[in-house]
A protein has these predicted regions:
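Polytopic transmembrane helical bundles with strong interfacial aromatic enrichment
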Residues: 1-199
Length: 199
């Protein structure tokens, strides 16, 4: 399965949702603020956030274990599976998180006026930037390098080893903001809103 086509499809859906929210803000807000939606949105958001975070951490650990094995077959299988999970599992979860999170945020007040909420949203976006610009490209480069190895190759090339090590740090950079989002979401501290940063 060509996971990059699936990822592009989900990115297009996300762009469409963002476009709809920007150009048809009143209609978008009316859909998400409906009182009957709140409890469902909260449950869906908590479940999706938990699954998304767990998938990210499990993927990091699984990749680290495959790298420690030194086996080309194990590493290739791991990266193929992680890429598949990112395309079929993480991408839809991101869309669900975005919609449920926006629905909840509209019920809390103006997104950029609530401190913990606005900072959480920025951290979620930061994690997404690491995922799109760092995680996905290195994942595909690793798959490409591993599939180019000859069946008898016992030693992994230096470029591949460097990428495998780099991915740990890229993944960590993407997961740490999510951990901070969880903390903000649970404790809801009184912190300055993002809108106040620019006044």
């Amino acid at each position: 399965m060509k996971t990059n086509h699936v990822l592009i499809g989900f990115l297009a859906i996300m762009a469409g949702i963002i476009g709809f929210a920007v150009f048809f803000q009143e209609a978008f807000t009316a859909l998400l603020v409906h009182p009957a939606v709140y409890s469902h949105a909260r449950f869906i958001h908590i479940a999706a956030a938990t699954l998304f975070f767990a998938n990210a951490v499990a993927g990091m650990l699984w990749e680290q274990r495959s790298f420690a094995s030194g086996s080309k077959a194990v590493i290739l299988h791991t990266y193929n599976t992680v890429a598949l999970l990112d395309a079929l599992f993480s991408s839809p979860l991101i869309i669900i998180l975005l919609l449920a999170g926006l629905s909840l945020s509209f019920n809390w007040g103006e997104l950029w006026q609530v401190g913990w909420l606005s900072v959480s949203f920025l951290l979620f976006l930061l994690s997404g930037i690491f995922w799109v610009l760092g995680d996905i490209p290195t994942q595909y480069k690793i798959k490409q390098l591993i599939s180019g190895l000859k069946p008898g190759d016992q030693v992994l090339p230096d470029q591949l080893i460097r990428l495998l090590r780099l991915r740990w740090w890229i993944s960590m950079a993407g997961v740490l903001p999510l951990l901070a989002v969880f903390i903000l979401m649970v404790y809801k501290p009184e912190i300055p809103a993002v809108a106040d940063w620019f006044r």
